Curated annotation (Swiss-Prot):
The keyword Coiled coil does not apply. Residues 70-115 are annotated as: Disordered. A lipid is attached at G2 (N-myristoyl glycine). Residues 2-174 are annotated as: Pre-S. Glycans are attached at N320. This is Large envelope protein.
Length: 400
């Protein structure tokens, strides 16, 4: 009995008329014929099992002559289970022999006259003729660009330009340029307002410090409030126009503004001197007169050409000149230092001290500034008896 059973099952892989209607032994996972035993229970990885590749495709008459299972039945809702004969598509060839597999080539694009007929209304000659107009040229070419073909002037350029603008419309405005053009003045206005508020607070702070010098140890108060005019108590820095101290407050503010203006001018002068825009002739050794301009014979020639005088010359009686080039930077500062050193000889003793201070690192300077700011008021009261000894110490240190 085992032989016919095994023979029938061995042929079920190719015989479409012998299906597995009851669903027993699906894919022969538990069939003892395919060595199902306790030593190899995992049939998912069994190499001897039969996957029945053709058993699921049930042909006509699989359930006997004239028998068609109703609405699906045991084999599901496939057309074969309903008894309908369908033609299965042929299996594709393997990938190694399939020369048509993979991405198909991109089809050829249709011609431009079919996809964009509006672009074919002008030929190349008319297009280059229309580019002669700077307004049209800006639409198609960047700044400084030019067309590769020769552009011939055409008398009907106005009509061509009008036709182009009637078809394409006016060019769109560049919003980036508009934004940058508006952002610049707004930033300048904001900076001016900020500086104006700070500048107005600086005189008030200096005025408060100035008036506090007259009220050491007592709260400041305006002396004009005790006059014949009844005025409420107020500070000397906020006198009303009816107060007698108002004119003194205005005078203090005016002096403070002049002081701030002087500081700004000094800063501008230092900046111009650093950039070499103040061509001041240095003092020549052994001479008190200098002159600028061409010389007959210069012992020292100035290098390069500039819009400023390049050398300073002394003109002796023999006609020859002694020339010294003007420094390219700090010319005015060097002139002031030479002038002061010639009249005050003790300033030369400060050169070594200045060179030593310049050699210090910025960290040391920041530390010194912080110490003076934090301990300065207390140190002044402690070191006040020793202040007369400071010039003596500086003189001894410079003479060593």
């Amino acid at each position: 009995m085992g032989a016919p059973l095994s023979t029938a099952r061995r042929g079920m892989g190719q015989n479409l008329s012998v299906p597995n209607p009851l669903g027993f032994f699906p894919d022969h996972q538990l069939d003892p014929l395919f060595r199902a035993n306790s030593s190899s229970p995992d049939w998912d990885f069994n190499t001897n099992k039969d996957n029945w590749p053709m058993a699921n495709k049930v042909g006509v008459g699989g359930f006997g002559p004239g028998f068609t299972p109703p609405h699906g039945g045991l084999l599901g809702w496939s057309p074969q289970a309903q008894g309908i004969l369908t033609t299965s598509p042929p299996d594709p060839p393997p990938a190694s022999t399939n020369r048509r597999s993979g991405r198909k080539p991109t089809p050829v694009s249709p011609p431009l006259r079919d996809t964009h007929p509006q672009a074919m209304q002008w030929n190349s000659t008319q297009f280059h003729q229309a580019l002669l107009d700077p307004r049209v040229r800006g639409l198609y070419l960047p700044a400084g660009g030019s067309s590769s073909e020769t552009q011939n002037p055409v008398p009907t350029i106005a009509s061509l330009t009008s036709s182009i603008f009637s078809k394409t419309g006016d060019p769109a405005m560049n919003m980036e340029n508009i934004t940058s053009g508006l952002l610049g003045p707004l930033l300048v206005l904001q900076a001016v307002c900020f500086l104006l508020t700070k500048i107005l607070t600086i005189p008030q702070s200096l005025d408060s410090w100035w008036t506090s010098l007259n009220f050491l140890g007592v709260p400041p108060g305006c002396p004009g409030q005790n006059s014949q005019s009844p005025i409420s108590n107020h500070l000397p820095t906020s006198c009303p126009p009816t107060c007698p101290g108002y004119r003194w407050m205005c005078l203090r503010r005016f002096i403070i503004f002049l002081f701030i203006l002087l500081l700004c001018l000094i800063f501008l002068l230092v900046l111009l001197d650093y950039q070499g825009m103040l061509p001041v002739c240095p003092l020549l050794p052994g001479s008190t007169t200098t002159s600028t301009g061409p010389c007959k014979t210069c012992t020292t020639l100035a290098q390069g050409t500039s819009m400023f005088p390049s050398c300073c010359c002394t003109k002796p009686s023999d006609g020859n000149c002694t020339c010294i080039p003007i420094p390219s930077s700090w010319a005015f500062g060097k002139y002031l230092w030479e002038w002061a050193s010639a009249r005050f000889s003790w300033l030369s003793l400060l050169v070594q001290f200045v060179q030593w201070c310049v050699g210090l690192s910025p960290t040391v300077w920041l530390l010194v500034i912080w110490m003076i700011w934090y301990w300065g008021p207390n140190l002044c009261s402690i070191l006040s008896p020793f202040i007369p000894l400071l010039p003596i110490f500086c003189y001894l240190w410079a003479s060593i």
